[in-house]
Amino acid sequence: MAIGPYLSIFTLNVNGFNVPTKRQRLAEWIQKQDPYICCLQETHLKTRDTYRLKVKGWKKIFHANRDQKKAGVAILISDKIDFKTKAMKRDKERHYITIKGSIQEDITITNIYAPNTGALQYVRQMLTSMKREINNNTIIVGDFNTPLTHMEISTKQKLTREHKL
């Protein structure tokens, strides 16, 4: 199926996906928003519980979960697009997943959940290791757990007059 001139992708840190009502509300939200691809971070699912990622109309589900209820990422692809999987890669800590495939042309999608401790170094290392594989059809999303500005690094910083809103 042709997808037109754009590809809608949503990314969301779900902060745990074990409560049935939360899964149901998220499934309804995904169906209402109707993106082609949905990337989730912090699924907190055990490997055996990945059936909980099911959403009606979304049969292609790629996940990286652990045997403990922490971390975890997933990429869900809508049945409305003809995604053909070529390869999948995930780390043993289940902090990222990369899928390579094609829709109308080759595409690579990486979904990252950086650990709270050492997040900046983790993201730098990830991007450095992926450097040779990144091209115009590479999409990298996720929760990088890094501050956007120096003001966000520490809540103990005093605000000067120019920084106050």
Q: Can you say where each PLM-predicted feature lies in the sequence?
A:
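A shared catalytic/ligand-binding motif for oxyanion handling
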Residues: 1-165
